[in-house]
Amino acid sequence: MQLRASVLLSFLGLASVGHAGNVENNHNVCTVRANGGHQDDVPNIMAAFKECGNGGTIIFPEDQSYWIATRLHPTLKDVAIEWRGKWTFSDNLTYWRNNSYPIAFQNHHAGFIISGDNITINGYGTGGIDGNGNTWYTAEKGDTQPGRPMPFVFWNVSEVIVDSFYVKDPPLWSVNIMNGTNMRFNNIYCNATAVDAPWGDNWVQNTDGFDTMDATNIQLTNFVYQGGDDCIAIKPRSYNIDIQNVTCRGGNGIAIGSLGQYLEDSSVANIRVDKVNIIRYNEDMHNSAYLKTWVGALVPQSSYESAGVPRGDGWGSIRNVLFSNFNVQGASAGPSISQDSGDNGSYAGTSKMSISNVAFVNFTGWVDTEKSVVSTVSCSEVHPCYNIDYDNVVLYPGKNATTAGTGSCKYTADGGVHGLSGC
């Protein structure tokens, strides 16, 4: 009787070594080699995820550069990914506009989505994703259009570790968690730079660094961001988020929100953000730490992020938030609260989101303003905010100012703001 090699190996108790294109499977360890040039590597990558994505190891070697020309969405379980090489998204804008995975939230799209459980990704300081975003930035020149693919999205995941990884020039948000539980990120670097933009022009809107939504028990440490939007954004239904050691260069700083854009509960609770450097870059650094919610009415919107339909009127609460140890170098504003997103001038103070138990602790540095007010608290007349604490917040209105700035408040509960001069 003649036996095939794979059958004979099974009789001998040995695992076979398989090859599928540029994928080598050695005892449930899949090593993926790039095709080279601008040949699509996604078929080989998906083959590796299929062969070794359940209880195995997947390796992208450091000397390999992969061309991502088509969308991909693997579901993985009990897998370790040694991501030492670089993925580069193709510059085929037409393909991505027409084929990226639609994300209902804010009319966005994704090019690469990971789902599953017990996933470890290590970039070892060399691995990551180049989103080829400069092609988009130059084409749109600051007027973001639908269809840009988010390059690194976690959707329906749990027990995830990501270490020593980068996302360079994302077309849209860099790292996005949507329905994730028990996730740890460490040594993450995100950079969105429009090399063709005139100095002072922001062509990299919507290139958030790290966003969470429907997320619980998320830890982020040692994070560096350069871009033109939220460095970090804590979005609806995020709970138990712990963030430490962050540097934000340019953009909007650390955001809670925006919340209440949709007719749903957008609550957020138990957030700590500690040890943050906020650095002005490209004449752009709008905020340092801020909370933003929508008005309590459906208001017509023209932006693509609202899909051109009325938005707002969401509800919920923001509670137990700590921002501490911020060094602010040239942001346009100090810590702030604004509950009038989406307003057309008729609905100020109507937000249905309540805000309480928020602390800003140990803020130092300067704010790029000619006014004396460096921090504003503008809450909701429907739910006046309370237990808003400022503790050792000393920010100067200008780099050479000698007198610390003050604050302004409205729609707050009586005695609801403590420690902010002017309130």
Swiss-Prot record:
**Which region is the signal sequence?**
1-20
- Superkingdom of this protein's organism: Eukaryota
The EC number(s) attached to this protein equal 3.2.1.67
| InterPro entries hit by this protein | Glyco_hydro_28 (IPR000743), Pectin_lyas_fold (IPR012334), Pectin_lyase_fold/virulence (IPR011050)
So which residues have sugars stuck on them? N92, N98, N118, N156, N179, N191, N245, N344, N362, N400
The record's annotation in PANTHER family points to: EXO-POLYGALACTURONASE, PUTATIVE-RELATED (PTHR31736:SF12), PTHR31736
The answer to whether UniProt assigns keyword Hydrolase to this entry is: yes
Q: Where in the cell is it found?
A: Secreted
Q: Which UniProt keywords apply?
A: Carbohydrate metabolism, Cell wall biogenesis/degradation, Disulfide bond, Glycoprotein, Glycosidase, Hydrolase, Polysaccharide degradation, Repeat, Secreted, Signal
Q: What is its main location?
A: secreted
Q: What does this protein do?
A: Specific in hydrolyzing the terminal glycosidic bond of polygalacturonic acid and oligogalacturonates.
Q: Which Pfam families match?
A: Glyco_hydro_28
**Name listed for the protein in its UniProt record:** Putative galacturan 1,4-alpha-galacturonidase C
Which GO molecular function entries does the Swiss-Prot or TrEMBL record give? galacturan 1,4-alpha-galacturonidase activity; polygalacturonase activity
Explain what induces or represses this protein's expression.
By rhamnose, galacturonic acid, polygalacturonic acid and sugar beet pectin.
Recorded GO cellular component terms are:
extracellular region
PbH1 repeats sit at: 215-236, 238-258
Protein family membership = Belongs to the glycosyl hydrolase 28 family.
- Could you tell me which cysteines form disulfide bridges? C231-C248, C379-C385
Quote the Gene3D superfamilies the UniProt record gives.
Single-stranded right-handed beta-helix, Pectin lyase-like (2.160.20.10)
Catalytic residues (UniProt): D229 (proton donor)
Name any Gene Ontology BP term: cell wall organization
| Swiss-Prot/TrEMBL catalytic activity | [(1->4)-alpha-D-galacturonosyl](n) + H2O = alpha-D-galacturonate + [(1->4)-alpha-D-galacturonosyl](n-1)
